[in-house]
């Protein structure tokens, strides 16, 4: 069922609001994907707080007008699914991970930090660890010397107790 003008304006407003908050937008062709697989992709996107939507390209072009993602408009051809996220890596990671298991989802382009990326750029962005992963690695590295020192002190205390007994 075609959308009337008010519905189209509502869709553009909704997507524009998401794009205004976004750091990353990823475009992927979804030609031939089964509905069940697309539902799994949407569920994974929701888990990662990625706004995932199939849009008419003309509506998507209007939504990105006047934003840092405007250069993506020339890539918006064919049946596309749009991944939009506030996290710099989440959209790229969700779409890239799904495209590895389903060859019918083809990454077309993306934009991060005002720069348009091709498929290789999106894949490179997806390979970067998330902020949480980096923080946990940093915490581990910082805790390692402290825990080693604590173990050395405990061993020294046990040795002193053994000598005293």
Swiss-Prot record:
InterPro entries: Ribosomal_uL10, Ribosomal_uL10-like_sf, Ribosomal_uL10_bac, Ribosomal_uL10_bac_type. GO terms for cellular component: ribonucleoprotein complex; ribosome. Forms part of the ribosomal stalk, playing a central role in the interaction of the ribosome with GTP-bound translation factors. Belongs to the universal ribosomal protein uL10 family. PANTHER family: 39S RIBOSOMAL PROTEIN L10, MITOCHONDRIAL. Part of the ribosomal stalk of the 50S ribosomal subunit. The N-terminus interacts with L11 and the large rRNA to form the base of the stalk. The C-terminus forms an elongated spine to which L12 dimers bind in a sequential fashion forming a multimeric L10(L12)X complex. This is Large ribosomal subunit protein uL10. It comes from Burkholderia cenocepacia (strain HI2424).
């Amino acid at each position: 069922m075609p959308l009337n003008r008010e519905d189209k304006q509502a869709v553009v407003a909704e997507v524009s609001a998401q794009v205004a908050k976004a750091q990353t937008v990823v475009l992927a062709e979804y030609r031939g994907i089964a509905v069940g697989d697309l539902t799994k992709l949407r569920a994974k996107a929701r888990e990662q707080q990625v706004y995932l939507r199939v849009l008419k390209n003309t509506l998507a072009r209007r939504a990105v007008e006047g934003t840092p993602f405007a250069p993506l408009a020339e890539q918006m051809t064919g049946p596309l699914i749009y991944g939009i996220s506030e996290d710099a890596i989440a959209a790229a990671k969700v779409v890239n991970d799904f495209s590895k298991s389903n060859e019918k989802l083809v990454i077309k382009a993306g934009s991060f930090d005002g720069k348009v990326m091709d498929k290789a750029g999106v894949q490179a962005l997806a390979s970067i660890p998330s902020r949480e992963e980096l923080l946990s690695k940093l915490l581990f590295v910082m805790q390692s010397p402290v825990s080693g020192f604590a173990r050395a002190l405990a061993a020294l205390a046990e040795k002193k107790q053994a000598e005293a007994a």
